């Protein structure tokens, strides 16, 4: 599992090996289920075993095939007594010789059942390693091996010493089946393999390099321990000083292989300020999205299987209050504002005036959708409220009714002008328009005028709460 220095891990409980202390079956589903199922959840482990011809190569004095069968048999024995656990065995490359180049040589040899270690061991004694390496075909066939059970945890463990030999893409197949929720992120054990061998299998799932027999035994134990051990996560949301005071924010655990959200939990702290403990399936890898505004996303959160993980994030928040002016009725009606992190193009949130919104502490640009638009730079501070308002508008009343083309410009202090508004193109000039206080210019030509020189220019001033009437061409 990936570990990072940004997080704190406390209350750690050891998992041990698969053959060691009793492990609890994880009670959280592969789907985004926050409530426990009514009946105990079943975990199904499908062993996908490579029986290609290369498995007969020697490995520390004995064929890889014999080592793999022996280790797999011992593991099945060690798991035989676990409740709510079913095992299955699919093999590939064992029905046809390598010379046949058969790319559909895979079969479910032992279907899922509880306490079926003897069946698995008996079947292993009858199989022969001799054929091709159709990993992709075997993966896709495994989709039909798992019973239709939406509440179960489906786990696939691939044991192989070779790469795909059938011009297919096992990585794409694995991703596709994970997205379809056939199984969780697979475990892949490369036996007797060189280091670069694993680089081509890492995309399948969690890869382990068992270059030695001793390592193979350890890896097998570790994989099963991860599968069966209970894992919990508590998330502390702190202020700028590291105090865990933030809460009531949705936490989304996103499967970073499939991109699908697996869990949504609205953060909770008890009366003592402690974050509650969440049951999270450690067989997935996650990005955590803390749905503050704007959201905080941490890629590859380091959740360790069989541990009581505590993750800590700084998410100091303050409140933005969009305060409307004291003018009733407001000629604008409902005014909206667009809030962006200072200097950022993306919108953090759009809100109507009269509302309050929690924001991460920091500087923001608030664009007020008045006419003309206003931009305010504000600083949101931890635990404080900052207000943004705008001057009460006045109203422009163009009294002349002429068809034509016109625009309104704001007059700036440096005597430049900034476009604000276009009158209806070719339509009537008569209108009532709420505007911000300030100096403006109206430029208009009638539709029937025979030249640009017949343009009328009128300067006017808008005052809060007042109506300014403007006539065109002296009318």
PLM regions and their residue ranges:
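Bacterial N-terminal signal peptides
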Residues: 14-26
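Exposed acidic/Ser/Thr-rich ligand/metal-binding surfaces
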Residues: 33, 43-44, 52, 58-67, ...
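C-terminal "exit" segments of structured domains
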Residues: 213-271
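A short, amphipathic beta-strand motif
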Residues: 231-242, 318-327, 395-402
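Short, ordered, surface-exposed loop/turn motifs in non-cytosolic proteins
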Residues: 241-263, 326-346, 402-419
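Short, solvent-exposed S/T- and G/P-enriched segments that are highly enriched in secreted/extracellular
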Residues: 261-279, 342-357, 382, 416-433, ...
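Structured interaction patches on ligand/partner-binding surfaces of diverse proteins
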Residues: 269-271, 291-316, 371-393, 447-475
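Short Pro-Gly-centered beta-turn/loop motif in secreted/extracellular proteins
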Residues: 269-287, 291-295, 353-365, 369-372, ...
């Amino acid at each position: 599992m990936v570990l990072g220095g940004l997080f704190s891990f406390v209350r750690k409980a050891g998992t041990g090996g698969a053959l060691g202390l009793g492990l609890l079956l994880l009670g959280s589903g592969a789907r985004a289920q926050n409530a426990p199922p009514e009946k105990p959840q079943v975990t199904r482990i499908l062993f996908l075993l490579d029986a290609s011809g290369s498995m007969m190569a020697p490995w520390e004095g004995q064929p890889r095939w014999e080592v793999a069968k022996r280790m797999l048999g011992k593991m099945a024995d060690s798991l035989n007594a676990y409740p709510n656990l079913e095992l299955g065995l699919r093999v590939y490359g064992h029905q046809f010789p390598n010379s046949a180049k058969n790319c559909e040589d895979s079969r479910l040899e032992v279907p899922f059942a509880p306490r079926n270690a003897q069946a698995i061991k008996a079947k292993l004694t009858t199989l022969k390693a001799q054929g091709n390496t159709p990993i992709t075909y075997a993966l896709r066939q495994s989709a039909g091996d798992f019973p239709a059970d939406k509440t179960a945890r489906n786990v696939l463990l691939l044991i192989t010493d070779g790469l795909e030999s059938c011009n297919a893409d096992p990585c794409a197949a694995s991703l596709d089946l994970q997205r379809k929720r056939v199984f969780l992120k697979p475990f892949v054990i490369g036996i007797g393999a060189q280091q670069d061998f694993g680089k081509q299998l890492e995309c399948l799932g969690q890869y382990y390099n068992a270059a030695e027999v001793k390592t193979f035994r350890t890896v097998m134990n570790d994989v099963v321990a991860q599968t069966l051990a209970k894992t919990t996560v508590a998330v502390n949301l702190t202020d700028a000083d590291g105090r865990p005071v933030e809460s009531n924010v949705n936490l989304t655990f996103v499967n970073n292989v499939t991109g699908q959200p697996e869990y949504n939990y609205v953060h909770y702290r008890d009366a003592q300020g402690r974050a509650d403990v969440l049951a999270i399936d450690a067989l997935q890898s996650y990005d955590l999205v803390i749905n503050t505004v704007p959201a905080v996303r941490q890629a590859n959160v380091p959740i360790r299987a069989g541990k009581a993980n505590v993750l800590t994030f700084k998410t100091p928040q303050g409140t933005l209050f969009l305060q409307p002016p004291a003018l009733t009725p407001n000629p604008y009606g409902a005014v909206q504002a667009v809030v962006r992190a200072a200097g950022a193009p993306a919108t953090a949130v759009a809100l109507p005036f009269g509302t309050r919104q929690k924001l991460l502490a920091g500087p923001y640009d608030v664009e007020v959708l008045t006419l003309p638009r206003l931009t305010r730079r504000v600083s949101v501070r931890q635990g404080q409220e900052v207000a943004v308002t705008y001057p009460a508008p006045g109203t422009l009343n163009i009294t002349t009714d002429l068809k034509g083309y016109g625009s309104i410009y704001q007059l700036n202090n440096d005597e430049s002008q900034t476009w604000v508004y276009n009158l209806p193109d070719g339509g009537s000039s008569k209108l009532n328009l709420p505007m911000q206080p300030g100096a403006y210019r109206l430029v208009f030509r009638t539709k029937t005028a025979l030249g640009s020189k017949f343009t009328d220019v009128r300067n006017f001033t808008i005052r809060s709460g007042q109506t300014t009437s403007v006539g065109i061409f002296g009318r």
